[in-house]
Amino acid sequence: MNQILLCSPILLLLFTVASCDSEQQLDSAMHLKSDSTKSASLKNVAPKNDETQAKIAKDDVALKDAKKGDYIMDIDISDLPLDDYPINRSKSLKSSSIDLNNIPFNKGLDDFPAKEKNQGSNQSALKALQQRLLTEQNNSLLLRNHSIYLMKEIEARKTDIIKVRQLNLDLELELNTVNRRLLELNGQLQNTRKSTKPCKKRSSKDSAPPAANQFQEANVRNTYRNKYLTLLKELSQKINNEIAKVATDVPTETNPSQGNLPTL
């Protein structure tokens, strides 16, 4: 009798587990079927309105009153809206665009101010990043303008360098031309020297005697001496004339004699 009483709860437990497994298999099959027919039924789904919402509410009440085994095989998935009333609530929540599993339902309403604070901090960080972005853009614009100015300066310097190089080339060409002309003149000079004959030296017999040279030197000396004396006489005559003029302008006690300076 005790064995029968112990076996009955075990059998009941096994029956419960088997029913749960069958329900889970049916739920998974229905979910797969709903996913496969979702694309085909999108065109037939009508927009939600008040009538459809009321109908769904009535169906919900009827489904709650009935047993799962009675209605689960009689429902046509294509006749139901996709997201209005899903059969398996947990799986519909997973398939929705909002992942409700990540929402911490176990936390209270005290966490919402923290979220608002986080949003405020995120907004302030976003504003700071925007301000930094504007600053970086301004700095990049300034650097770009400076780089453009430097590039223009570099181009101008390159132009000057090219001009100087061209001028150096012109000067080198002129220098080569002058050197070539000098070489030609040196060649002509060498040819002229070769073409001319050296003069013959005078012999000792043809040279003048020493007495004649001395006489010529004496004549030259006398000539220069006579010129010197003549100039000296003319100078003394001019001096005497000037003295006479001064004597007539300034009266003195004694008349100056010729060749003597007047006394005041």
UniProtKB/Swiss-Prot annotation:
Instruction: Indicate the secretion signal residues.
Output: 1-18
How changing L5S affects the protein? In strain: La28 and La106
Q: What is the effect of changing D79N?
A: In strain: Au2, Au3, Au8, La13, La32, La37, NC-004, NC-006, NC-008, Ny4, TW1, TW5 and TW8
Q: Where is this region: Sufficient for promoting ovulation when expressed in females?
A: 1-138
Per the UniProt entry, the effect of A46T is: In strain: AF2, AF7, Au3, Au5, Au9, La3, La15, La27, La36, La54, La120, Ma18, Ma21, Ma31, Ma37, Ma43, Ma53, Ma74, Mo36a, Mo79b, NC-002, NC-003, NC-009, NFS 5.4, NFS 6.4, Ny3, Ny5, Ny7, SFS 2.4, TW10 and TW11
- Give the site residues for Cleavage: K48, N49, K67, K68, K117, N118
Q: What is the effect of changing L109I?
A: In strain: AF1, AF2, AF3, AF5, AF6, AF7, AF8, AF9, AF10, Au2, Au4, Au6, Au7, Au8, La3, La10, La13, La14, La15, La27, La28, La31, La32, La37, La46, La58, La60, La62, La105, La106, La116, La118, La120, La125, Ma3, Ma6, Ma11, Ma18, Ma20, Ma21, Ma23, Ma24, Ma31, Ma35, Ma37, Ma43, Ma50, Ma53, Ma56, Ma57, Ma74, Mo40b, Mo52B, Mo80b, NC-001, NC-002, NC-004, NC-006, NC-008, NC-009, NFS 5.1, NFS 5.2, NFS 6.1, NFS 6.2, NFS 6.3, NFS 6.4, NFS 7.8, Ny2, Ny3, Ny4, Ny5, SFS 1.1, SFS 1.4, SFS 2.2, SFS 2.4, SFS 3.1, SFS 3.2, SFS 3.3, SFS 3.4, TW1, TW3, TW4, TW5, TW6, TW7, TW8, TW10 and TW11
Q: Which residues does the annotated region (Necessary and sufficient for homodimerization) include? A: 219-264
Question: Localized where?
Answer: Secreted; Cytoplasm
Disulfide topology: none
Query: Sorted alphabetically, which InterPro entries does this protein's record hold?
Result: Male_ac_gland_sc
PTMs per UniProt:
Glycosylation.
Effect caused by changing L32Q: In strain: AF2, AF7, Au4, La3, La15, La37, La58, Ma21, Mo29b, Mo36a, Mo52B, Mo79b, NC-009, Ny3, Ny5 and TW11
**Might you report a single GO cellular component term?**
extracellular region
**Keywords assigned by UniProt, alphabetized:** Behavior, Cytoplasm, Glycoprotein, Secreted, Signal
Bias category Basic residues: which stretches? 194-203
Recorded consequence of changing S39G: In strain: Ny2 and SFS 3.4
> Disordered: where is this region?
189-219
MF terms per GO, please? Answer: identical protein binding
Q: What is the effect of changing D65G?
A: In strain: AF8, Ma3 and SFS 2.3
Give the function comment from the record: Male seminal protein which enhances ovulation in female Drosophila by stimulating the release of oocytes by the ovary following mating. Acts by increasing octopamine (OA) neuronal signaling in the female genital tract leading to the postmating relaxation of the oviduct muscles. This activation of the OA signaling pathway is likely to indirectly contribute to the mating-dependent increase in the number of OA synaptic sites in the female reproductive tract.
Q: How is this protein organized at the quaternary level?
A: Homodimer.
Name assigned to this protein: Accessory gland-specific peptide 26Aa
Q: Which organism is it from?
A: Drosophila melanogaster
Q: What is the lineage of its organism?
A: Eukaryota, Metazoa, Ecdysozoa, Arthropoda, Hexapoda
Gene behind the chain: Acp26Aa
